[in-house]
C-alpha cells in the first residue's frame, strides 16, 4: 500500500479542535500531547465498557504495550506516535511491518509527527485511509460512533454516513419529455427510479443516466452483430460535408392535474456502489434509462440529442420545469419537493457518455458530472479514420447493435406486441444512416458528436479514464478534456487500467475527493477543498499517482525507424484467416510475438522517453492495389514488471459504504512481470490519409505520405527499454477482415515516429 492523499483539507488548530469536539473527541488544548493522544485512543474503543483492555492490545514500543506506556512517565515520541497510528489504521506489527520507519517511508505516510501539532495530527489521522480502504472516521461511523439521525454531519469538508439506509424511500415517477421519438403523436414518458433517505432537508441528487438499467436484450444484440469478414470498399473520391444542427425540443404545456400521493414503488435496482456511498451521506440516488427502455416510451435513438433530452427532462423536473406523473395513466402529477434541484451525474461507459452529452446542453441544475470511461464522439467509438473499427473486445458491434441491446421495451411482451413493427422500421432507418459500408463520417455521426458543443459546458467536470481502455479509447477523454472551457473547474484521473471503475482502489482516495467536491457543489459547504486538475497513475511503479499540468504537449521528439523497405502482406492462408477470425485473441498473441503479417521495428532507447499526448507515425507508404488499410501498435516490449490492466480484489468486503451498508471489495492494479505492454494503437483507411472529410484515391504502387495519429497516452519509458513499432493491415479485433491479395510497402528511410514529450 502507498498513500496518495488528495482529499485531505489542511485545517487550522482551532477548526481541527472544533471538528473533533463535534465528533465527541473532547480534547483539551492545554493538555500534553501524550494525554491528548491517550484520550483520543480511548474514544476509539467506544464499544468497550473498559478501554484499558483494547488499549493493552496495542503496542507503543517493541517492548511496551500502549496501556503500560500511558501509565508510565515516558514522554510521547515520534516512534511511539507512528507505531500507534499505524495500528489504529489496521496495520499489524510483525505481520504488515517489522521496522516502522521503513514501512512509513514505503507507505509515503502523510503525517509527520510534531508534538506541538498533536491535535492537527489526530484530525489528519481520522481523515486518513485505513488498511481496509476506508478512512478512519468512516470506519468509526460505520461501527456506530454517530447515530443515523438523517441529518448532515461533516468532517474535514466531507459528509459522514449518518443517513439511515435501512429506511430508504424507493419510488417511481414518469417524467414527460419534450420528445416524440417513436412518432406516435404522444410525448415520451421517462421512467425514473428514485432512492432517497428520509430527511426533513432538501436533498441533492446523484443521477445515473443508464440505458442498461431497465434490462438488456442480449438475444437481439447477438442476432444483429455484423460479420467482420468483408472486402475493404474502394470509395469514390469526394468531400464530406456536415452541418451543426441545434436540437429543438417539442412544446409542452403546464400541468394542471392534482398532486398524487400514491407512487409506484420498487424493492431493488442494480445500484452503483459510489452512489450507495453518497446515499448514506444524504444524497438521493436516481436511475434513469431514457427513451426506448422498459417502463419508458419512445424509440432508442442511441447517442443523439433526443436521447440526451430524455435525461435532461429529469433534471428539469427536479427543478420544477417539467412534469412527472404517478403512472402512465397520467391522472396525477408529482413534484420533486424533496430535492434541492442540484444534480451530479455518475457512471461509466455509456452512462458517463450520457453525462458528457447532458453537460453540453448547459442545463440549469446540473452542477457536476463524474464521467468515467466516457465517449465524446460516437464516430470515434465505432469508426476510425474512414474505417469501420469495432471497440476493443466487441468485433461486429455497431450503434444499431447497441440499440437492439438497450431497446428494453421489447423485453415487455405487451410492448413488443404493440410497438415492435414500428421499432423495426426506425431501427432499419438507423442501420442505413450509420453507413457501415464506407466507414465515413456523415451527418448521422455528427449529430452524435458532443465535442462540437463542449463550449456550452458550465458545470464542474470530473473524468476518469484508463490508458489501457481499448473499448472506449483514450482519444475520447483526450479530446473532450482539452475542449472544455477554461472558465469551468475540470479534473481528470488517468489510470493504467482498462475499462474499469476506480472508486474502490487502495492507492487513490477518489471516493473521499468526490465527497469533498460534492459537498462544495451540491450542498454549498465552504470547505476550501482544491483538487488538482489532472492526476496520473505512474506506469513505472505500483501505487504512485502524480499531478500533471496537461494531457498532450507540443514538445516532440522524432525517432527514426530505419533505412529498409518493408513489405506488409495483407493476405493470409485460408486456415490461418479462419482461425484468427474465430479468435481475435490468438491473432493478437501472434502479432505481439512477430508471427502475424507485419513490419516490425524495435527501438532501443538511449534515454528516458516520457510520452504525453498523441504519438504520430509519419510514413512513406505505397499499396499494390487501389485500396489499403493501415494498422499500427506501439509496445513497451521486453520482460519487466508492469502494472496489470485489471484491478484485483485485495479484500472481499472491507469497504462499508454506510453503516453496514453496501459493502464492496478493496481493489488495486497488480504489479507483476510480463512480456509487453501496449502503449498505443491506431487504424486508418488510406483513402482518408489527409483528413476525415476528404476521400482520396490510392494510386497503385505510388508513394504516399501518411500521418497516422495514435491513441493519446501518458507513459514513461526508461533508458534501456525497447519500444516496438508494429505496422500491419487487418486487425482481427478492430477492423474489417479483408483477405484480398494486396501488400503495403513502407520506406523506413523517409518515415518517423513523432513522440510528444512531457516536460519536467
Swiss-Prot record:
Enzyme class: hydrolase
InterPro entries noted in UniProt: AB_hydrolase_fold (IPR029058), Galactose-bd-like_sf (IPR008979), Pept_S15_Xpro (IPR008252), PepX_N_dom (IPR015251), PepX_N_dom_sf (IPR036313), Xaa-Pro-like_dom (IPR000383), Xaa-Pro_dipept_C (IPR013736), Xaa-Pro_dipeptidyl-ppase/CocE (IPR050585)
GO molecular function: aminopeptidase activity; dipeptidyl-peptidase activity; serine-type peptidase activity
Active site per UniProt: 349 (charge relay system), 469 (charge relay system), 499 (charge relay system)
Chief subcellular location: cytoplasm
E.C. code: 3.4.14.11
Coiled coil: none
Record carries keyword Membrane: no
One of the GO biological process terms: proteolysis
Keywords: Aminopeptidase, Cytoplasm, Hydrolase, Protease, Serine protease
Gene3D superfamilies assigned: 1.10.246.70, alpha/beta hydrolase, Galactose-binding domain-like
Domain of life, source organism: Bacteria
Subcellular location: Cytoplasm
UniProt GO cellular component terms: cytoplasm
Catalytic activity as recorded in UniProt: Hydrolyzes Xaa-Pro-|- bonds to release unblocked, N-terminal dipeptides from substrates including Ala-Pro-|-p-nitroanilide and (sequentially) Tyr-Pro-|-Phe-Pro-|-Gly-Pro-|-Ile
Self-association and partners: Homodimer.
Family: Belongs to the peptidase S15 family.
UniProt function note: Removes N-terminal dipeptides sequentially from polypeptides having unsubstituted N-termini provided that the penultimate residue is proline.
Designated name of the protein: Xaa-Pro dipeptidyl-peptidase
Species classification: Bacteria, Bacillati, Bacillota, Bacilli, Lactobacillales
Gene: pepX
